[in-house]
Amino acid sequence: MAKRTQKVGITRKYGTRYGASLRKVVKKFEITQHAKYGCPFCGKVAVKRAAVGIWKCKPCKKIIAGGAWELTTPPAVTAKTTMNRLKKLQEEQAAAAALEKKN
């Protein structure tokens, strides 16, 4: 038997309502919202969305605050990399100051 939801996928529940372009946008959000993500604590791919912005890992029982539809949002990734870069820079400056103090 042929697959009946080749294009519509998860948005088949909306039928012909709301227009094709809006259903495509909703499809993108719903796929990311229902997907499983990797846990930053235990490393297993078992993090699922519990509520808006709340994500739970089944094996390690951790609850993570994240984005509404995705576990990590692009602004959160940017902020995290900036903080890591500043932390590394601060450690390098502290090490250089300690080395200068020694000499």
Curated annotation (Swiss-Prot):
Species in which this protein is naturally found: Tetrahymena thermophila (strain SB210)
Protein name per its UniProtKB record: Large ribosomal subunit protein eL43
Keyword Transmembrane: no
Keywords assigned by UniProt, alphabetized: Ribonucleoprotein, Ribosomal protein
Entry similarity comment: Belongs to the eukaryotic ribosomal protein eL43 family.
GO cellular component term of the entry, any: ribosome
GO MF annotations, alphabetized: structural constituent of ribosome
Lineage per the UniProt record: Eukaryota, Sar, Alveolata, Ciliophora, Intramacronucleata
Domain of life the protein comes from: Eukaryota
